[in-house]
Amino acid sequence: MKHLTEMVRQHKEGKTNGIYAVCSAHPLVLEAAIRYASANQTPLLIEATSNQVDQFGGYTGMTPADFRGFVCQLADSLNFPQDALILGGDHLGPNRWQNLPAAQAMANADDLIKSYVAAGFKKIHLDCSMSCQDDPIPLTDDIVAERAARLAKVAEETCREHFGAADLEYVIGTEVPVPGGAHETLSELAVTTPDAARATLEAHRHAFEKQGLSAIWPRIIALVVQPGVEFDHTNVIDYQPAKATALSQMVENYETLIFEAHSTDYQTPQSLRQLVIDHFAILKVGPALTFALREALFSLAAIEEELVPAKACSGLRQVLENVMLDRPEYWQSHYHGDGNARRLARGYSYSDRVRYYWPDSQIDDAFAHLVRNLADSPIPLPLISQYLPLQYVKVRSGELQPTPRELIINHIQDILAQYHTACEGQ
C-alpha cells in the first residue's frame, strides 16, 4: 500500500506527519470516518481486530471478507475512492485461542492470516506475544518472533497466490497492557525501554532471516510500543514526552521504521500531536469514537424526553441497560465496585464496553425509534445548545443540518478532527 510506505518515507524526511487508524466496526463510526476523510481528501485506515473479525466470524459475526465487503459497500455509497481505503488487521496471531495448546492455536492463527490477506487487508499486525495453554509465561522474544515469522510467511504466500504479488505492510510487537483499555485502575505506566524495543526488532529480524524473509524487512513499517498512554474506566494517563525521549530517539536509527501507539483514545489534542512528532506516528483510536457515538445518543435521548410523551419515547437508555444486565458477558469482568459504580460504568466508562451491545436487535430498534421520533419535526435550537453545544455552534453557523443522524456523525467527527490535526505534519 503506497499510502503507508509514502507516509513513513515523509515522516523519516522530517515532515512530522502520521496516520490514524479507525478501529471500529460500527456503521455510524465508519460513516463518520469515511465522510471526514472524503471532505479532507486523505486516505483512510480502518482496522479490524482478531477479536472482532476472524475466519469463524469473531464477535461481530463477520469474517475478514464480510468486513471488507461491508466497509467497501459503505465507501461506495459515500463515493469514497477504494484506492484511498486501507484495511488493517490488528493483533493477528493466537490471541483468540490462548486456551488451546500452542500447535492448535497457531494452526488457527495461520488460517486467520490467510483469511485476512485473501480478503485484501494490506496492513498486517503480527502479534504472537500471548502464551497458549502449554506455553511458559511470559514467552521469550525468540518464540514470539519465530511465530510471527511463520505467520509472515503464510501472509506472503497467500498474498502472491491471490493478488500475484506481495505488497503487504507489517507491524510487529505489542503494547504491554491488554488491547482495548486496561482492566484495572491505573496510576503509573511503564514506557517501553529502548533495549526492549531493540531486542524485539532483532529477534524478529533474525526469525525472518531464518524463514528466508529478509527481503520483506523494509515492509515492516512499525513497531508497537508503549509510549506511556492508557486509559481505564474514569482516568487517562497522559503522554509525558520526557519519559519517552530515549525510546523516541532510538527509532531514528531505523531507516524504514516508525512506532505504532495503541490506546491513544482520550489523549489531549496536544498529546496526540506530540506523539506523532516523537515518531509514534500511527495512532490507533477505537473506544473514543464509540464513546462519542454513545454521548450523542444519550444527548438525543435526553432531548427526546423533553419533546415526546413518555409512552411514545424510544426508551433507548433503559433498553440498553436491560440488555446489558441480561447479557453481562462483555462488561462483568471489567467493571467492579457496588451496584451504583457498575451502573455508572456501564453507561459512562472510558473503556466503553457498551460498544459490544449496539448490534443487539432490541437496542437497534430503540435507536431507530429514537431517530424517527426526532426526525419528524425540527429539534428546537435551545435543546441542541443544552445537550450538544459543540454541534449547536455549527448548526447556527449553517455548517450542520440539525437532524439526529447529522448531529451524531458530527459529534464523532469532532474526535476524528483531533487525530487528523495531529497527523497532518508540516
Swiss-Prot record:
Pfam families: GatZ_KbaZ-like. One of its GO terms (biological process) is D-tagatose 6-phosphate catabolic process. Pathway: Carbohydrate metabolism; D-tagatose 6-phosphate degradation; D-glyceraldehyde 3-phosphate and glycerone phosphate from D-tagatose 6-phosphate: step 2/2. InterPro entries: Aldolase_TIM, GatZ/KbaZ-like, GatZ_KbaZ_carbometab, TagBP_ald_KbaZ. Transmembrane segments: none annotated. GO terms for cellular component: plasma membrane. HAMAP family: Tagatose_aldol_KbaZ. Belongs to the GatZ/KbaZ family. KbaZ subfamily. Forms a complex with KbaY. Component of the tagatose-1,6-bisphosphate aldolase KbaYZ that is required for full activity and stability of the Y subunit. Could have a chaperone-like function for the proper and stable folding of KbaY. When expressed alone, KbaZ does not show any aldolase activity. This is D-tagatose-1,6-bisphosphate aldolase subunit KbaZ.
